[in-house]
Swiss-Prot record:
HAMAP family: PdxT (MF_01615). InterPro entries: Class_I_gatase-like, PdxT/SNO, PdxT/SNO_CS. This is Pyridoxal 5'-phosphate synthase subunit PdxT. GO terms for biological process: glutamine catabolic process; pyridoxal phosphate biosynthetic process; pyridoxine metabolic process. The keyword Transit peptide does not apply. In the presence of PdxS, forms a dodecamer of heterodimers. Only shows activity in the heterodimer. Its EC number is 4.3.3.6, 3.5.1.2. It comes from the Bacteria. Belongs to the glutaminase PdxT/SNO family. Catalyzes the hydrolysis of glutamine to glutamate and ammonia as part of the biosynthesis of pyridoxal 5'-phosphate. The resulting ammonia molecule is channeled to the active site of PdxS. It comes from Mycobacterium sp. (strain JLS). It catalyses: aldehydo-D-ribose 5-phosphate + D-glyceraldehyde 3-phosphate + L-glutamine = pyridoxal 5'-phosphate + L-glutamate + phosphate + 3 H2O + H(+); L-glutamine + H2O = L-glutamate + NH4(+). The gene is pdxT. Keywords: Glutamine amidotransferase, Hydrolase, Lyase, Pyridoxal phosphate.
Length: 206
């Protein structure tokens, strides 16, 4: 691991990258820092190789897939996930972490699955941006509900063995965990509640 010493304790802080090709990178960097990680941006292969874990932010999943290819990160990222690198994806990040993407986009510009979590995810399942919504939902492992902000959000339609459902909204799966990989259909990085990011940072250290 590339963990760095934490000046507040003897426990090293995990170095968590945020994929910074497109999407709400800055909000995740702030949330991870407040959750106790050493947060850095990832745009190049050498930066991907230097982190202990990766956050794939919200944004546009087809654009992010295109940029992963352009920056020659798609296959190296798939390889690191297959090797067990912890990862957290929010919204578009959840879509990309799936093994199967439903309604993946127009031919030639599809969102490409990274195959990190054994699940099938439907893009924009809750509707267009004008149909975005928010609300409080129970979240397994947290002591109270989280305020979830959904923006053109996906939902999970299938999970494989070993995938734990952490939250649902309107009967649909919107948060899952498999091993040291986490995914949410909503955006905890925009609310000021750092518990989901703290959960992930703790997972990285497991």
């Amino acid at each position: 691991m590339n963990a760095v010493p934490d000046g507040r304790s003897d426990k090293p802080r995990s170095v968590v990258g945020v994929l910074a090709l497109q999407g709400d990178t800055r909000e995740h960097l702030a949330a991870l820092t407040e959750a106790g990680a050493e947060a850095v941006t990832v745009r190049r292969l050498r930066e991907l190789e230097a982190v202990d874990a990766l956050v794939i932010p919200g944004g546009e999943s087809t654009a992010m897939s295109h940029l992963l290819r352009e920056f020659e990160l798609l296959e190296p990222l798939r390889a690191r996930l297959a090797e067990g690198m912890p990862a957290y994806g929010s919204c578009a990040g959840m879509i990309l972490l799936a093994t199967e993407i439903l309604d993946a986009g127009a031919a030639g510009r599809e969102a490409t699955p990274l195959k990190g979590i054994d699940m099938s995810v439907r893009r924009n399942a809750f509707g267009r941006q004008v149909d975005s919504f928010e609300g409080d939902i129970p979240f397994v492992g947290l002591d109270s509900s989280v305020h979830a902000v959904f923006i053109r959000a996906p939902w999970v339609e299938r999970i494989g063995d070993g995938v734990e459902v952490l939250a649902r909204a309107d009967g649909h799966i919107v948060a899952v965990r498999q091993g040291r990989m986490l995914a949410t259909a909503f955006h905890p990085e925009v609310t000021g509640d750092r518990r989901v990011h703290k959960l992930f940072v703790d997972m990285v250290s497991e």
